[in-house]
Amino acid sequence: MSEWKKVKIGDFLTEREGRYKSDDSKISKYKRLDKIDFSGTIHISDKPTKTDMIIVHPGDLVISGINVAKGAVAVYQGDEPVCATIHYSSYTLDSSKVDLVYFKYFVKSPEFIAALQKQVKGGIKTEIKPKHLLPLEISIPDLQTQQEIVKKISLQLKKTEQLSVEIESQKNYIKQLRQNILQEAIEGKLTADWRKQNPVQKGNPDYDAEALFEQIQKERNNEKKQKELSPITDEEKTFEIPEGWKWVRLGEICKKITDGTHKTPKYTNSGIKFVSAKDIYNKELDFSHCKYISESEHKELYKRCNPELNDLLISKSGSIGTVVLNNVTFEFSLFESLALIKYTQSELVPKFMKFAVQYICNNLTISDIKGVCVKHLHLNVLSGQTLGLPPLAEQKEIVNKVETLLTKVKTLENQITEREQLTKQLMQSILKGYV
């Protein structure tokens, strides 16, 4: 049975010293270590920085001071040195005392986290520098036992990695399944059997989209004279719509398509909520971290852009094309990164509109997104998008079908998430059981 003994990490790990200004000629020829991801992969970059630098040599153990507790540790395997910001530290290791792979596993183990929490002020919330790492006391077995442990861990982790690959494949399948459901709904395939039982009734908006469209136009023109959009070409009709449906442009069935203020308001500590694309989380509006503006400024902004219950909000920048159905009754204001779509809710079912606009956004092409450095979805592009408009009764049936299917998909998704969490726990338990 091997004997475990307490040692300081500094007994076998030595910091590679040297600190350089970012414009120092000694490092000008080197590429830069951009980041170490949580899987331990090193990413190299040519991006400049003004932060002070260190030099990392081939074979060095490199640790991210900010993310070491999340697994950002790696051995640099390049052929020539690179530089890294001082948020990283580089070490040589005495291989007669500690196996390098064993120590990498140890740094990713619960025991290492526990040592940080116990021996370093601030624990894992502190940026871990050599002065924190090297004095840490840990327990390790003899070198031969370390190498035996590495073999066992590697074998077990290989199995969990295979599980992770399977889970990632299942997650991609779920994503594709959601898109397929949406596509079949918006193309009328989900409600093919329903239409057999509910044939077209000319002049009835519930069962005739042409009549529904005429009704929508009356409502829109009663409120404001609407700008005419160009006729829809055959090339824009991307699928064959069912009998009783009608090809329309989004701008033809909406009362308003606008966006939030383009001028940054004066923020306050409280008042009226002011949201941007950053406040969309999991395809829902999340007000928990939003900004606030005064009531007087809100009233001025609300005259042009007035989100109300069941209006649609669409992210115009960042994660472009995420669609949210507003489910709150209180007033709030928008920044320019969010578009607002208002429509007549008596003629268009809110959840159907969300599905339809999300389908449109999913199929936007690169040419639809404007901008060189910062990409944006322009309102005129959104307004000109085409969709097949179903009669009112069929819109309701589409919503029922989609929600039933998405509930089943959500159940599958929860099962995959549970498997993913169990796999992560398994990886941690493997490390805990050996190191």
Question: At which residue positions do the language-model features occur?
Answer:
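Short, Lys/Arg- and Gly-enriched loop/turn segments at beta-strand edges
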Residues: 69-76, 320-327
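Cys/His-rich finger/ribbon microdomains and the adjacent scaffold used
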Residues: 204-249
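A generic structural signal for residues embedded in beta-strands
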Residues: 63-64, 314-315
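Short coil/turn segments at secondary-structure boundaries
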Residues: 22-31, 118-120, 192-198, 226-234, ...
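Low-complexity, Lys/Gly-biased intrinsically disordered segments
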Residues: 4-52, 65, 70, 232-233, ...
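Short amphipathic coiled-coil heptad-repeat segments
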Residues: 1-3, 157-200, 218-221, 225, ...
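Basic, amphipathic alpha-helical recognition segments used for DNA target recognition
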Residues: 5-20, 58, 78, 89-140, ...
